[in-house]
Design a protein with these regions (language model features):
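Mature, function-bearing regions of proteins
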Residues: 2-230, 234-308
Length: 308
């Protein structure tokens, strides 16, 4: 990247959420899938949708706003304003550009299908099994990020590769926030964390294609990339818990999934791509996550750095 691009990229950290928060900094694979996209949106929380291959879909709502902010406004000042926005119920900082403020107000609204009873069940499960879930976040989901080829390469050749442990620590904030009893409540922080991360992803989509070190035909962080990372978290966690015989009531299991469904929505994943059940999550994961897992030189180096 040019010096100007690096400065702009570094400046828009959305108040402390590092580039690639949630680990979704990934390069869209332009090659055809081994099998055509076939997962039906009828299995989603929306129950319907266009059924387009998520590799061809990004986040136009966020992208247009963030691109204009990066090109036309003082990003350092915006970042300073965003650092003051921490809790879900806080007013959006008045010093932000109007278009960005309007986007944040829109993006932080919980989806209409949010079920607070299910969210409570998810917290009960996390509280009960918190230790083992935390271990899985680190050693299953965290290590898995190094064998997602596009993600590993993108992180390795970005600032995330230079400060990988710091990046993991900041990504872990999302894992912590989602497990709190007030995650999506006014005094919680999860909604803010998700919206800031969504804005960072939009910034990456705008800036990386301008870099001479980035293939111009690749637009990073498609809906597919977000879904791959999403499945490396709740789907992978629940699969391991089930395999190990960790008990979970129906209320707890559905609640844990629901906390991540709401998270996915707030991160900008379209409702038509969010699985409505664990069964659908496993089916979708088989198509989007499992086929891409493979070692790379960059991923091996990141894994080595992570384990030191």
């Amino acid at each position: 990247m040019t010096g100007r691009e690096v400065n702009r990229r570094d400046a828009l950290k959305a108040g402390g959420v590092a580039l690639g928060g949630l680990g979704a900094l990934a390069m869209t694979n332009a090659s055809a899938r081994a099998e055509p996209w076939s997962w039906s949106p009828q299995g989603s929380v929306a129950g319907q949708g266009a059924g387009a291959d998520p590799r061809t879909v990004w986040d136009p709502e966020a992208d247009a706003v963030i691109a204009n902010v990066l090109e036309r406004h003082n990003v350092n000042r915006i970042n300073a304003e965003l650092r003051t926005w921490v809790r879900n119920g806080q007013e959006v900082p008045s010093g932000l550009p109007a278009e960005l403020r309007d986007f944040i107000e829109y993006a932080r609204i919980l989806p209409p299908w949010t079920d607070h009873n299910k969210l409570a069940g998810g917290f009960e499960f996390t509280k009960k099994q918190g230790t083992i879930i935390s271990v899985l976040y680190a050693f299953a989901s965290g290590m898995m990020s190094t064998v997602i080829p596009n993600e590993a390469r993108a992180v390795y050749y970005s600032k995330g590769g230079q400060f990988f442990k710091d990046r993991i620590a900041k990504t872990a904030k999302l894992g912590y926030d989602i497990g709190t009893v007030n995650a999506y409540a006014p005094d919680g922080q999860m909604t803010v964390t998700c919206v800031k991360t969504r804005m960072i992803h939009a910034a990456v989509r705008h800036l990386l294609p301008q870099s001479p070190h980035w293939p111009k035909q690749y637009v990073p962080i498609s809906q597919d990339d977000l879904m791959v990372t999403w499945h490396s978290l709740p789907t992978t966690i629940m699969a391991n818990l089930t395999k190990w015989g960790v008990p979970a009531s129906r209320h707890e299991s559905q609640g844990y999934l629901h906390t991540w469904q709401v998270c996915g929505h707030l991160l900008g994943i379209r409702d038509e791509y969010l699985p409505a059940s664990w069964r659908e999550a496993n089916v979708q994961s088989t198509q989007v996550l499992k086929p891409v897992l493979a070692p790379t030189r960059e991923g091996i180096r990141l894994a080595d750095d992570l384990l030191r």
